[in-house]
């Protein structure tokens, strides 16, 4: 039991609580302590009956317990911990903002196209961001073959199509959500030499103890570790999985 506690506490903070929520919801549902009926995304319940908690729970629901849930949970654990411990090392506030931003985008898509459970979209968005932040790395799929990490989300896209036989529209929209975030925080600023177009709100930064994060408040390129000149602004940053 001590080993499990030690392992759980070793997970970076945002990933730790997200993992607990992703796992806890279907476990509690299987024990009949909660019902998915009160957690999925629905416009009428959310905005007309003010079930605003659905905006938080829907992006964290993969499915009920089962083999596919387990596979998706493993993928989530792999890529969220890599992102937060590598690309967002010491910047858990920026990582939390990244998750909030992509969740908002996925919620908008979910409301438009009537997707009720958005957990797999959250995972796909993070996988896309990871692939863009670590494009030259090497990834493998189920241990069968290796490829450049930049292709990772597209490999998942094809795999989901082969598994289900249905066009993976929600996966593609999740990639769009991830790309919007990466474009605003990396592609456009890097191409034009300007600060990121969105930044982590102060209230999110205040959640975390920032005393030892960065004494000089210098933002660094996750690929090189070198300081990034930001024209006097302290912008939050979003990055991808590998």
UniProtKB/Swiss-Prot annotation:
Belongs to the derlin family. It comes from Dictyostelium discoideum (Social amoeba). It comes from the Eukaryota. Residues 214-242 are annotated as: Disordered. This is Probable derlin-1 homolog. Residues 233-242 have a biased composition (Gly residues). GO terms for cellular component: endoplasmic reticulum membrane. The gene is derl1. It is found in: Endoplasmic reticulum membrane. One of its GO terms (molecular function) is signal recognition particle binding. Keywords: Endoplasmic reticulum, Membrane, Transmembrane, Transmembrane helix, Unfolded protein response. The keyword Repressor does not apply. Residues 214-224 have a biased composition (Basic and acidic residues). Its main location: endoplasmic reticulum. The keyword Nucleotide-binding does not apply. GO terms for biological process: endoplasmic reticulum unfolded protein response; ERAD pathway. Residues 40-98, 162-167 are lumenal. Residues 1-18, 120-140, 189-242 are cytoplasmic. It is a multi-pass membrane protein. The chain crosses the membrane at residues 19-39, 99-119, 141-161, 168-188. May be involved in the degradation process of specific misfolded endoplasmic reticulum (ER) luminal proteins. May also involved in endoplasmic reticulum stress-induced pre-emptive quality control, a mechanism that selectively attenuates the translocation of newly synthesized proteins into the endoplasmic reticulum and reroutes them to the cytosol for proteasomal degradation. InterPro entries: DER1, Rhomboid-like_sf. It holds the Pfam family DER1.
């Amino acid at each position: 039991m001590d080993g499990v506690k030690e392992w759980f506490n070793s997970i970076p903070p945002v990933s730790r609580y997200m993992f607990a929520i992703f796992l806890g919801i279907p476990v509690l549902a299987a024990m009949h302590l909660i019902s998915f009926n009160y957690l999925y995304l629905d416009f009428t319940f959310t905005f007309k009956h003010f079930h605003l908690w659905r905006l938080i729970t829907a992006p964290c629901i993969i499915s009920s317990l089962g083999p596919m849930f387990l596979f998706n949970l493993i993928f989530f654990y792999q890529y969220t911990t890599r992102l937060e411990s590598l690309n967002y090392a010491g910047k858990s506030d920026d990582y939390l903002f990244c998750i909030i931003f992509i969740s908002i985008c996925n919620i908008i898509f979910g409301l438009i196209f009537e997707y009720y459970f958005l957990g797999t979209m959250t995972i796909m968005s993070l996988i896309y961001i990871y692939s863009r932040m670590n494009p030259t790395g090497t990834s493998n799929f189920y241990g069968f073959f290796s490829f450049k990490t930049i292709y990772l989300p597209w490999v998942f896209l094809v795999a989901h199509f082969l598994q289900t036989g249905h066009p993976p529209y929600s996966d593609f929209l999740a990639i769009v959500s991830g790309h919007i975030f990466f474009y605003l925080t990396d592609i456009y600023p890097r191409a034009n030499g300007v600060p990121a177009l969105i930044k982590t709100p102060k209230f999110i930064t205040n959640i975390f103890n920032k005393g030892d994060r960065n004494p000089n408040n210098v933002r660094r390129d996750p690929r090189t570790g070198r300081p990034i000149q930001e024209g006097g602004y302290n912008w939050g940053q979003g990055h991808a999985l590998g």
